[in-house]
Amino acid sequence: MELKPNGNHNNNNAAEKSEDTEKAKAERTNWGNGLEFLMSCISVSVGLGNVWRFPFTAYENGGGAFLIPYIIVLFLIGKPMYYLEMIMGQFTSQGTVKIWSICPGFVGVGYGQAFGTICIISYYSSLLALTLYYLFVSFQSELPWSFCREDWQNCVDSRPAEYTENLITGLASNASTLASNLTTPFSNRGVSLLADNETVKLQSSSEIYFLDVVIKEKLDISDGIGSPDWKLTLALLASWVVIFLVIMRGVKSSGKAAYFLALFPYVVLFVLLIRAVTLEGARDGIIFFLQPQWGELLNPTVWKNAVVQCFFSLAVGSGPIIMFASYNRFDHGIYRDAMIVTTLDTLTSLLGGITIFAILGNLAHNLNIENIQDVVRSGTGLAFISYPDAISKFQAVPQLFSVLFFFMLFVLGIGSIVALQSTIVTIICDQFKGLKYWKVALGTSMCGFLMGLVYVTPGGQWILTLVDFYGGTYVVFILAIFELAGIVWIYGLQNFCDDIEFMCNRRVSLYWRMCWSFFTPVMMIIIFIYSMVTIEPIKYSELYFPEAGNVAGWLLFGIGAAQFPLWGLWYVSRHREGSFCSSIMASLKPSEKWGPANAEVKREWQIFKSQKAAQRAVQKESSKLGFFWRKITNFCGSNI
């Protein structure tokens, strides 16, 4: 059955609506050209998620065992969701909230995704602060994390291998003496060296520098998280100043910056890759990363982590893709862009993974450790421990490579957070048309800076883990399920495919139809249910959070997930049509605002939809298979 917008349709109202949509279209800026859109999508999807999060996620899930589930998830969930969000943004020329004129009762999905995006922004900026800090100290005559201080117990220099080997030999010969010092806070971290039946805990100087000099990590936050570090606070402030300058003029400024944000990181990443694969032991690390462990394919946790990483890397379910696509021309060829970005994202993740595991292989070789998993703990500190450690081993001007690397990380982070921040600014500006874009950008940037202060405290990494787990991961996950259900199951796959055909002038393939209607939602639902049933109290650095932390985490998740039903009820209460049940049913139909923003294009679309409905009516009458034929065509969204 063809869905029709609800509400009155008299000529006067139609004329007024046409004028409003035309005015809205005129007010909305478009990209300078299609390449700016592509570069912007690359800058957000090919970001810290590839260089920072993908390697340590693969590390936590057995290296190569993670690659097969990740690639399968990419094709059955990642690509379909990415393409769907691109279509929604370009078709409506609206942001994350306004697109829900397709199914007004689901408007809470947009607000919930905005909440999840704010959570991600809050800690993402702290990562930028860390990269800036490392960038600044890289200009010293000797990299400060490359050598051990006198008061650093059981420390191994991150200098070239010949120095490290001599140090380990000395440690091994005096293991009994060092064993008495294992009561220090460092004994819970690092790697072990077995000699004379005594286990000596070793740490690279890069790890100690990060944990005890930079973030001044607390191993227990039961007494609080401490005060913000003033150096990291200044770095955080500088990061937000840059973010504001990039987004202050909307796509006019961010589109131009996207060329640099998208392309420069690849130059540095290739340089680091070449250096990493030439290090001793790199081969073992790469083999560990690429060699699949087939038994892990049956581990549901690995599949759940693959979905989470796919969402994080592609920025699916948090709004940037919809927001970017909303600034496109209606006839822009987004299919090509979607395929380019999703493919490039995967290749970059593999490139980043090979680079980091080559470095881990070298680290294991220098520390005489057989199991690469024992080299360094995983987590957010991986990029600030293993990468700096490798850079310290560069024979020629390591300071130069360090500056290039951390500048690359900063550029990657800026590209990601600019997209996330622009999503929030676009939502606010779409809701309140009278507000100046730059003022909203300034206000949200100030709020982002204040929220980021929590993460530059000694207990900040604990809070980052908590917010990422409850506010970023699970909120985005569950709302993505509702997003797909509202578009494909409520609005209807057949209607959606017709809209794509009208906009892109191409039929939707069976691959997309099967993924959207069955494989993608079913896999997401199964994985989400499993993850909720088997969920355990989260840990940081192998330590459990205090009870108050878990309560705060579930409260964070509850606030994000509750946006969906609460805003749905709000819409129903504001648009009553008869009984409560009738109002709910009406809220699940497209509103008058659904469709292309341009009035002329919208009229053409309505004619196209009417013609499609007439064609299907004729086909149903002529079909000999009757009921079953109609079910097949409705399921596939195709005029077979």
UniProtKB/Swiss-Prot annotation:
<keyword id="KW-0325">Glycoprotein</keyword>
<feature type="transmembrane region" description="Helical; Name=12">
    <location>
        <begin position="551"/>
        <end position="571"/>
    </location>
</feature>
<feature type="transmembrane region" description="Helical; Name=7">
    <location>
        <begin position="340"/>
        <end position="360"/>
    </location>
</feature>
<keyword id="KW-1133">Transmembrane helix</keyword>
<feature type="transmembrane region" description="Helical; Name=9">
    <location>
        <begin position="447"/>
        <end position="467"/>
    </location>
</feature>
<dbReference type="GO" id="GO:0006814">
    <property type="term" value="P:sodium ion transport"/>
</dbReference>
<keyword id="KW-0812">Transmembrane</keyword>
<dbReference type="GO" id="GO:0089718">
    <property type="term" value="P:amino acid import across plasma membrane"/>
</dbReference>
<feature type="transmembrane region" description="Helical; Name=4">
    <location>
        <begin position="228"/>
        <end position="248"/>
    </location>
</feature>
<protein>
    <recommendedName>
        <fullName>Sodium-dependent nutrient amino acid transporter 1</fullName>
    </recommendedName>
</protein>
<keyword id="KW-0813">Transport</keyword>
<comment type="similarity">
    <text>Belongs to the sodium:neurotransmitter symporter (SNF) (TC 2.A.22) family.</text>
</comment>
<dbReference type="GO" id="GO:0005283">
    <property type="term" value="F:amino acid:sodium symporter activity"/>
</dbReference>
<keyword id="KW-0472">Membrane</keyword>
<feature type="transmembrane region" description="Helical; Name=2">
    <location>
        <begin position="64"/>
        <end position="84"/>
    </location>
</feature>
<feature type="glycosylation site" description="N-linked (GlcNAc...) asparagine">
    <location>
        <position position="181"/>
    </location>
</feature>
<feature type="transmembrane region" description="Helical; Name=3">
    <location>
        <begin position="117"/>
        <end position="137"/>
    </location>
</feature>
<dbReference type="InterPro" id="IPR037272">
    <property type="entry name" value="SNS_sf"/>
</dbReference>
<keyword id="KW-0029">Amino-acid transport</keyword>
<feature type="compositionally biased region" description="Low complexity">
    <location>
        <begin position="1"/>
        <end position="13"/>
    </location>
</feature>
<feature type="transmembrane region" description="Helical; Name=8">
    <location>
        <begin position="400"/>
        <end position="420"/>
    </location>
</feature>
<feature type="glycosylation site" description="N-linked (GlcNAc...) asparagine">
    <location>
        <position position="174"/>
    </location>
</feature>
<feature type="transmembrane region" description="Helical; Name=10">
    <location>
        <begin position="473"/>
        <end position="493"/>
    </location>
</feature>
<dbReference type="GO" id="GO:0042943">
    <property type="term" value="F:D-amino acid transmembrane transporter activity"/>
</dbReference>
<dbReference type="GO" id="GO:0015804">
    <property type="term" value="P:neutral amino acid transport"/>
</dbReference>
<dbReference type="GO" id="GO:0042940">
    <property type="term" value="P:D-amino acid transport"/>
</dbReference>
<keyword id="KW-0915">Sodium</keyword>
<feature type="topological domain" description="Cytoplasmic">
    <location>
        <begin position="1"/>
        <end position="30"/>
    </location>
</feature>
<dbReference type="GO" id="GO:0015179">
    <property type="term" value="F:L-amino acid transmembrane transporter activity"/>
</dbReference>
<feature type="transmembrane region" description="Helical; Name=11">
    <location>
        <begin position="515"/>
        <end position="535"/>
    </location>
</feature>
<keyword id="KW-0739">Sodium transport</keyword>
<feature type="transmembrane region" description="Helical; Name=6">
    <location>
        <begin position="306"/>
        <end position="326"/>
    </location>
</feature>
<feature type="transmembrane region" description="Helical; Name=1">
    <location>
        <begin position="31"/>
        <end position="51"/>
    </location>
</feature>
<comment type="function">
    <text>Unusual broad substrate spectrum amino acid:sodium cotransporter that promotes absorption of the D isomers of essential amino acids. Neutral amino acids are the preferred substrates, especially methionine and phenylalanine.</text>
</comment>
<feature type="glycosylation site" description="N-linked (GlcNAc...) asparagine">
    <location>
        <position position="197"/>
    </location>
</feature>
<dbReference type="GO" id="GO:0015175">
    <property type="term" value="F:neutral L-amino acid transmembrane transporter activity"/>
</dbReference>
<feature type="region of interest" description="Disordered">
    <location>
        <begin position="1"/>
        <end position="25"/>
    </location>
</feature>
<feature type="compositionally biased region" description="Basic and acidic residues">
    <location>
        <begin position="16"/>
        <end position="25"/>
    </location>
</feature>
<dbReference type="InterPro" id="IPR000175">
    <property type="entry name" value="Na/ntran_symport"/>
</dbReference>
<keyword id="KW-0769">Symport</keyword>
<feature type="transmembrane region" description="Helical; Name=5">
    <location>
        <begin position="257"/>
        <end position="277"/>
    </location>
</feature>
<dbReference type="GO" id="GO:0005886">
    <property type="term" value="C:plasma membrane"/>
</dbReference>
